[in-house]
């Protein structure tokens, strides 16, 4: 498969998660009314999804190390399709939460296994460039998903957003059946021994550099995720915009993602990964300070309230390809496992931000700015601490257990 086509397929698989997260955001008030539940309880449809997503990322990489990349991806798409159509016709709020959990449990496979496929197929700057290109294409999803969701909601009701994600899943499954190659040869697969797998996870979590770098990636993304989780309140209440106006936040956000990813990919062969990470973290820190200053002195309004969100996304997408690649490379023989754990930590932080942090902060634009700045400070501290650790010791320990 050509590199360009592989990039598009992997980006499409990675986009499935943002579609499931963002398409139904404009429908939060309608879901609250339909099931007669509070807005805080509706927020848990996002938290349940993210918690299931985080938990299952622990298994997809390991399963793909044992059974191959392609079969696990195809199985996950089937489960996601069932969850999507079930959510569309959920008879009660409890069933909606159940089917959202099914979506979350399967949405992460493409993202996790896609990272492993990149590292199976490419190395060094070429791998970093593909990861950056995937992020650039993947970044379109958060922009178009809430816009599509808003128009679908207005035209057909909140259930139509889940019918839409079902349709996208079917198209992705057809694309994978036709063109996704198997990147892990049978001779390279790891035996499926649950005891050894559990020990491998434990050893990886005890590897300080891996854990610290995974936390750095998670909190760098967490400052971005805070605004995604708070989007219904930020856009509909703080900015006073209608359901069809989610593009005011998500289009600038994705412009930053695409711009940072494009620059990261362009510089991958000429600038060291560590330097790009440093530049990205500095950009995020400067943006956090700007966001605090703006919301301290002025009331949040369009277009100025979304500029810091765009700049933060730019810095994050400049840094994350290098941060992700160096984290996975700590365990070169078990990249599926490493990708699972790294994504588990990232999505666990996202779930905590969505379920607990966002409800504490989304009533104030200034509080959201403080939350974003705190996230980048934590990311920088964890990355600095992780960079000081000696890497490689966990890799040899894990190889011996298989």
Residue ranges with predicted function:
Residues 95, 132-178:
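Helix-loop-helix hairpin linking two adjacent transmembrane segments in secondary transporters
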Residues 34-36, 68, 89-95, 106, ...:
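Helix-breaking motifs and short loop linkers at transmembrane-helix boundaries and internal kinks
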Residues 55-94:
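Conserved MFS/SLC helix-loop-helix module at the cytosolic interface between two early adjacent transmembrane helices
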Residues 79, 83-86, 94-102, 303-309:
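Paired small-residue
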Residues 99-140:
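Cytoplasmic helix-loop-helix junction between adjacent transmembrane helices
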Residues 27-55:
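Extracellular/periplasmic helix-loop-helix junction of adjacent transmembrane segments
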Residues 183-214:
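Juxtamembrane intracellular "pre-TM" segments in multi-pass secondary transporters
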Residues 71-85, 166, 276-291:
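Structural signature of the two symmetry-related core transmembrane helices
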């Amino acid at each position: 498969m050509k590199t360009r086509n592989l990039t598009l397929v992997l980006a499409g698989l990675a986009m499935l998660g943002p579609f499931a997260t963002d398409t139904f955001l404009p429908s939060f008030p309608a879901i609250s009314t339909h099931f007669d539940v509070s807005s805080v309880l509706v927020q848990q449809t996002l938290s349940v999804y993210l918690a299931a997503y985080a938990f299952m990322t622990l298994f997809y990489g390991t399963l793909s190390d044992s059974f191959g990349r392609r079969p696990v991806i195809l199985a996950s798409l089937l489960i996601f399709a069932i969850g999507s159509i079930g959510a569309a016709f959920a008879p009660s709020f409890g069933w909606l939460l159940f089917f959202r959990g099914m979506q979350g449990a399967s949405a992460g496979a493409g993202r996790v296994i896609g990272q492993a496929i990149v590292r199976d197929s490419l190395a060094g700057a070429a791998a970093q460039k593909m990861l950056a290109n995937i992020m650039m294409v993947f970044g379109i999803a958060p922009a178009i998903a809430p816009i599509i969701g808003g128009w679908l909601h207005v035209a057909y009701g909140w259930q139509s957003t889940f019918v839409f994600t079902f349709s996208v899943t079917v198209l992705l499954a057809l694309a994978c059946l036709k063109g996704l190659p198997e990147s892990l040869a049978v001779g390279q697969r790891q035996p499926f021994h649950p005891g050894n797998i559990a020990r491998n996870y434990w050893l990886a979590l005890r590897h300080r550099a891996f854990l610290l770098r995974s936390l750095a990636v998670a909190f760098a993304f967490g400052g971005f995720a805070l605004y995604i989780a708070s989007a219904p309140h930020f856009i509909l209440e703080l900015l006073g915009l209608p359901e069809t106006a989610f593009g005011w936040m998500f289009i600038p956000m994705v412009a930053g993602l695409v711009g940072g990813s494009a620059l990261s990919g362009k510089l991958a062969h000429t600038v060291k990964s560590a330097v790009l990470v440093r530049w990205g973290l500095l950009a995020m820190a400067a943006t956090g300070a700007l966001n605090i200053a703006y919301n301290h002195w002025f009331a949040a309004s369009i277009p100025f309230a979304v500029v810091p969100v765009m700049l933060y996304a730019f810095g994050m997408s400049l840094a994350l390809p290098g941060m992700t690649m160096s984290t996975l490379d700590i365990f070169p023989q078990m990249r599926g496992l490493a990708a699972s754990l790294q994504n588990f930590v990232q999505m666990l932080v996202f779930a905590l931000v969505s379920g607990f942090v966002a409800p504490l902060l989304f009533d104030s634009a200034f509080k959201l700015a403080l939350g974003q700045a705190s996230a980048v400070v934590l990311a920088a501290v964890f990355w600095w601490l992780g960079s000081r650790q000696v890497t490689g010791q966990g890799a040899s320990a894990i190889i011996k257990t298989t």
